[in-house]
Structure formats: structure tokens, C-alpha cells
Amino acid sequence: MKRIDELKDIIKGKKATEAPKAPERELPEPGDMSMSLTEVLMRRRSSLDFSDAPICDEDLVRILWAADGLNGKGNNANHRTTPTTLNWKEIDTYVVKANGVWLWVPERRVLSFVHEKDCRKDFCLLQPMVKQAPVHLVYVYDQAKTQGLMTDLAMQIV
């Protein structure tokens, strides 16, 4: 748990510091996927075998788009591919790779640099075989995005 607390501190530090601007990596358009949803669901399996081969940006952006991307085009691209309570967008997706920790920013399709340390082994806890996976996605609930709204909502109910 200490390692997770360290990551929380890293993330809090990232949010607390506005300057200097963190380096960003723009990712390509996700592109069309060739498999139907039915086929994807039929082929879905859990596996404990992980390759350490890097994931190319084209595949990574497709995974991130499915995990928390924007659907639609142009001005209509304001809805997430995943549900969010009252459109609060309270969950952030962090990409943990050998070259550090990055925040996924779906509105701009970029990875924003957070921390330079390779933290992948810190997320294995009871599954050490996971540490060789080239990418870990970490979902972080940002309570600050909902705190005031939840208080207002609770007051209306009472």
C-alpha cells in the first residue's frame, strides 16, 4: 500500500503544480477497429502471460479511446466512451510505462508527463507476473471534481 500512497502523492503533486507545463506526447487518431463488438466479447479472455514487447502508439490510443476516449467528431466530440455520473468526468486514466507515468487527456488525445520513475512493479502487489507488461492503466477517482456538487445534491434531497 505504501507504493500506491507514493503514486497518490506524485499525482497530487502533479495537480498542485501548474508551472512549468509538463511535456506532452500527442497520440494519433484511434482509427477504425475491424472487429465487431460481438466478436470482441466472444474472444475476451483473462491471461497471466504478458509479453514485455512495447505497445505501439496506434494500439495504445485505441485502448485508451475504448477505456476513456471521446466519441463523435468536431464539436460533437464531448461525450466519453465510458459512462460518467452527471458528466462529472471524475475518473482520470494514468498510463504507467517504463519511461514513467503519464496522464491520458482525452480532450486533446495526449499523454501528459507526470513522473519519470518506472512504477510498473509498484502496481503488481499480489500478481508479480504483471510487472513485465509494457503498459499499466491506473484509474484514479478525483473526489475534488464531485465534492461540491455532491454536497449541493445532498442538501437538495434533505
Over which residues does each language-model region extend?
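N-terminal amphipathic, basic helical "cap/leader" segment at the start of enzyme domains
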Residues: 1-133
